[in-house]
A protein has these predicted regions:
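Active-site neighborhood of HAD-like aspartate-dependent phosphohydrolases
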Residues: 1-43, 134
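Conserved Lys-Pro-Asp/Glu-containing loop-to-beta segment of HAD-superfamily phosphomonoesterases
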Residues: 4, 94-122
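Short catalytic/ligand-binding loop motif for oxyanion handling, primarily in non-cytosolic enzymes
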Residues: 14-16, 66, 73-77, 105-107, ...
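Substrate-recognition element of Asp-dependent hydrolases with the DxDx(T/V) motif
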Residues: 46, 51-79, 85
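Active-site donor-binding segments of glycosyltransferases and PAPS-dependent sulfotransferases
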Residues: 75-103
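Acidic, Mg2+-coordinating phosphoryl-transfer loop and its flanking beta/alpha structural elements
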Residues: 110-143
Length: 147
């Protein structure tokens, strides 16, 4: 039986700042303190370099799920994240999307996340801190998990 692996979206699979060049100046001013509340912002993001290829590799070795959080104040975020997964990871991946503000409630061996927030630091398995010194990029994560 494959081990369970959860992967966060924002700044792990998805390059959150890449959307800023696709929003209007008016939106930047209006939402300057809450950029994740810009309507449809999550649909404007590019993948992190090597994220898609790494997801495909890891999916062959693990029972892989996408575990992300969406802001309550941005109703489009929930559907935007689903559509992003369908577009970039394919039809089979979207049925593996879990949106939760309590990541620690999920059972599994690994969680790849860039922040300790929303229960990541309390996850019962191993938290792989993406973009840290130990795991600065997808190549380092794949090397660690597959080798």
């Amino acid at each position: 039986m494959k081990k369970i692996l959860y992967i966060d979206m924002d700044n792990v699979l998805v390059d959150f700042p890449s959307a800023f060049e696709r929003v209007t100046e008016t939106e930047k001013i209006k939402y300057r303190d809450d950029m994740d509340e810009i309507p449809n912002i999550f649909s404007k993001m590019d993948p992190i370099p090597n994220a898609i290829e790494s997801f495909e590799i890891l999916s062959k070795h693990f029972d892989t799920y996408i575990l992300s959080t969406a802001p309550w104040e941005n109703p489009s975020a929930w559907s935007d994240k689903l559509n992003w997964v369908k577009t970039h990871l394919g039809q089979s991946a979207y049925k593996r999307l879990i949106l939760s503000h309590n990541k620690n409630l999920n059972k599994g061996e690994y969680l790849i996340d860039d922040r300790p927030a929303n229960g990541a630091k309390d996850f019962e398995g191993e938290w792989i801190h993406f973009s840290s010194d130990r795991f600065p990029d997808w190549d380092s994560v794949v090397r660690y998990l597959v080798n």
